[in-house]
Amino acid sequence: MRLEHAWDRLRPRLDAGRIVLGITGPPAAGKSTVAEQVHGWSIAAGIPAVVVPMDGYHLAQAVLDARSWADVKGAPHTFDAAGYADLLRRVRTQAASDSTVWAPRFDRSLEDPIAGAIAVAPDDRLIITEGNYLLLEQDPWRAVRACLDECWYLELPDGVRRERLTRRHQDFGRSPQEAAHRALGTDEVNARLVAASRRAADVVIRAD
């Protein structure tokens, strides 16, 4: 399905109240870009919306270093999945009379999450959350899917995905050799894990 068609399908449901939309797919599938695109369409339609990325629930770099997990940063066990699910439950049940819910965001310059950086207001009708493991069928990630009203899976050719990943790692300061090693190593393992969850998506979008 095209992204525009997925939005047209979702748009009427927002008239009835809040929707928690998940956007998932392997690393470098374009999840953040799509989330921002949908957010823009929602705002343009007069529907208050906010993006709450899964990346805000990365474990702190100090924790990863202490547990020797730094080399596999981005794998499922390097996130606070239970905390992420708790936030989505709060967002899902947030009433008009409730106070703002504060969510963390991941700061690339620090390589660490920052608490209380994203405000989810009671009148936000579309909550967009994006990340690799929204459909992962293992605990504690299983609880995340239960919090989503709908989840879209982004799919793109493996060659394009690997090229994007390699370029991204170089942009973050890795050498070409280090970037390729990461893209074809840990990232590839994670991508296969995410691909196995594709069948649980409500919509599959062919990413550009």
Residue ranges with predicted function:
Residues A115-G116, D139-R142, Q170-D208:
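Small-molecule kinase domains that catalyze NTP-dependent phosphoryl transfer to phosphate-bearing small molecules
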Residues Q37:
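Active-site signature of alpha/beta-hydrolase-fold catalytic machinery across serine-
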Residues G40-V50:
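Post-Walker A helix-loop "phosphate-sensing" segment adjacent to the P-loop in P-loop NTPases
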Residues L110-R168:
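ATP-dependent NMP and nucleoside kinases share a basic, alpha-helical "lid"
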Residues V34:
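Hydrophobic positions on the alpha1 helix immediately C-terminal to the Walker A/P-loop
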Residues M1-G22, P26:
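Extreme N-terminal, non-catalytic leader segments
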Residues K31:
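Conserved lysine of the Walker
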Residues V50-P53, L59-L110:
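Conserved nucleotide-sensing/catalytic segment adjacent to the nucleotide-binding pocket
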